[in-house]
């Protein structure tokens, strides 16, 4: 079962099962927001085809690659937990400007349980990453709101960065923020231009770019491309 092809196929199948579950979870959350008449326009900017592409194509492919890379080791569980959580949070935030805090809380609890069982020596630094990540973005949000007299971050963004901090550790939070900021400026700017929306006055969800930064930095850390951080976050 450790043959790369078998691992790849098995990972894709696991990703499909996970994708079907997360697709249903995201759809139910978005439908609930519409039914409760939450103060957004009631219709996602992108059709449900986005969810199908992300959960039924991208997630299985990423899961297959992770399985082929990790093999059947405990680290694969941690990888899939982070990947699945970030995928579903990114899609929900992109379509509704909201974050499902249930996903964040469950992911934090499962990661804590994983660390307790498989890497208890890293539990403390993971919790530090959680607290620093959440506190950092909350503090930056207060500063932005004070200076600009308007909210710049969503209420769930600090919790999302805290979640990411459990995987990348506090040293990885800076690179995550840099990737999120640059990708948000570039990709968000392109999206606004295509929609013919004003660049400075149209809100763009920041969560998807945090998810992109978190996943990218974590994979770079684990693959050894950030060796100066590996001693602190190699779990």
Q: What are these model-predicted stretches?
A:
Residues 1-235:
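A membrane-topology feature that recognizes alpha-helical transmembrane segments
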